[in-house]
Regions:
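N-terminal amphipathic/basic-hydrophobic helices that include classical n-h-c signal peptides
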Residues: 1-11
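Conserved alpha/beta-domain cores
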Residues: 12-228
Length: 228
């Protein structure tokens, strides 16, 4: 999402002072977000056309770390249709406000609302998927279930089994992506590529989980052959 990046101590100080549950932003900030979203969507549309891909075949997920509820709503009003959070604690703070305000707009959020929408025969197009895109510690699973639809950072059988058990106990099915460290960089998380097929098969057979694909980040290099 549009905004300045903050790291380290500056990020900690920022998080201490920002009310992430805030639901109201001024018109200038809303317009800034709208303009940023439209620029990105236009670039995606141009890239799809240049690559000969169907319009809408590339899905944009807005990473909403450090953005408050009002800012996220502005992004959704501008055309964002999938959101992702890095931190379980931010999901906890924002989920209720987002679900309430999105409901007023005719949308549903996350796995709970999706189930309710299905019961009410609501159109699937009104659903806003909510992803966890950051690392998940086992003791934080309860913070993200049953709010998120998809957990994108599953990199071991142990973590998958714990998520599956919690999901089954709640009577829900959670989407997961198997995180693969295909670049081999030690600074990145994920299983080794040589283990990916075996892990994917085992995770795909677990109750309570729906394996949706892989999450990978390529090496930060300019060589197109290496990237591919």
């Amino acid at each position: 999402m549009v905004g300045n990046l903050r790291t380290g101590a500056a990020m900690t100080a920022y998080m201490d002072h920002k009310d992430l549950a805030n639901e109201v932003i001024d018109q200038a900030r809303a317009q800034e977000i709208t303009d940023g979203v439209h620029r990105v969507l236009d670039r995606i549309a141009s890239a799809e056309s240049a690559a000969g891909r169907a319009a809408g075949s590339v899905q944009l997920l807005a990473a909403t770390k450090t953005r408050d509820v009002g800012e996220i709503l502005a992004a959704i009003d501008a055309g964002i249709r999938v959101i992702g959070e890095n931190r379980p604690q931010e999901i906890t703070v924002k989920a209720d406000g987002l679900a309430k305000r999105l409901g007023e707009r005719g949308y549903s959020l996350g796995v709970i609302d999706a189930a309710e929408a299905d019961t009410a025969n609501a159109a699937a197009a009104t659903h806003i998927p909510f992803h966890l895109i950051g690392q998940l510690q086992a003791n934080k699973i309860s913070k993200v279930l049953p709010v998120v639809d998809t957990i994108e950072s599953v990199d071991s059988i142990e973590l998958a089994e714990k998520i599956a058990r919690r999901a089954t106990m709640r009577g829900i099915t959670v989407g997961v992506l198997l995180e693969v460290n295909e670049s081999g960089e030690e600074s990145k998380s994920g299983c080794a590529p040589s283990h990916a097929i075996d892990l994917a098969q085992r995770i795909g057979a677990m109750g309570g989980l729906r394996l949706q694909g892989l999450m990978t980040i390529g090496a930060h290099v300019d060589d197109e052959r290496t990237i591919r």
